[in-house]
Regions:
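ABC ATPase NBD coupling module
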Residues: 68-84, 105, 110
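Hydrophobic anchor residue at the start of the ABC signature
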Residues: 147
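A short, proline-enriched helix->beta-strand linker immediately N-terminal to the Walker B motif
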Residues: 152-156
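Conserved ABC ATPase signature
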Residues: 133-137, 141
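Short helical segment in ABC ATPase nucleotide-binding domains corresponding to the A-loop/adjacent helical element
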Residues: 96-104, 114
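Conserved ABC ATPase "signature" region
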Residues: 111-129, 180-181
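Catalytic Walker B motif of ABC-type/P-loop ATPase nucleotide-binding domains
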Residues: 158-162
Length: 214
């Protein structure tokens, strides 16, 4: 699966484009990085790719997954996963039930669903935490659980919005490795926005600076 941006730009109503038009190809398992100052439109770009662009903004150009233009599709049809800087888990669900929320619809049997979640928890280093209250997890554990929930939905591409910015240095390094390894192993194209050059270096993919690149 390849993610392609072809002359993509976002313009507010009555205004000028937030950033120069972007053309970029992200290969399977590759993490491309978008950098730039606050307010330039990094998160708005991700909203546009995911199909969540706010009213009052216009998208130009095209967004393609495996050569198919997904720009006209609603968010649920795009199957683009999102990972945010705040690892949001539903407080009324256990850790395991949070992950089960992300399972693809074709997986219906209770035993099959439970096994898939337990396997995901194991890969995330969260064995035995199925019934745990998510409020008791550490920041790193919450982030890993949130990523596994996203991956259980089998996204065709992944968007990362400052996913490591609220973690301390040690946790940040660990979660970077965990996240990028899963992206590469599953051959998912990913696009990350960040302020941190260390994130871009660890991603080891194309880098777009919205202040200069098009």
């Amino acid at each position: 699966m390849t993610l392609e941006l072809q002359a993509v730009a976002v313009t507010p109503k009555g205004g000028v484009a937030l950033f120069p038009a972007i053309s970029l190809t992200v290969q399977p398992g590759q993490v491309a990085t978008v950098m730039g100052p606050s307010g330039i439109g990094k998160s708005t770009l991700l909203d546009a790719i995911g199909g969540h662009l706010a009213h009052g903004f216009t998208l130009s150009g095209s967004i393609r997954l495996d050569g198919i233009d997904i720009t006209p599709l609603p968010p649920e049809a795009r199957r683009v996963g999102l990972m945010f800087q705040d690892a949001v888990l539903f407080p009324h669900l256990s850790v395991g039930d949070n992950l089960a929320f992300g399972l693809v619809r074709r997986m219906r049997g209770r035993a099959e669903r439970r096994a898939a979640v337990e396997a995901a928890l194991s890969r995330a280093g969260l064995c035995g935490l199925y019934d745990r209250d998510p409020a008791t997890l550490s920041g790193g554990q919450r982030s890993r659980a949130a990523l596994m929930r996203t991956l259980l939905a089998e996204p065709r591409a992944l968007l990362l919005d400052e996913p490591f910015s609220k973690l301390d240095a040690t946790l940040r390094d660990d979660l970077r490795t965990f996240t990028f390894d899963h992206i590469r192993n599953r051959a998912i194209p990913a696009l990350m926005v960040t302020h941190d050059p260390a994130d871009a270096k660890a991603a080891d993919g194309p880098v777009i600076d919205l202040t200069t690149d098009g």
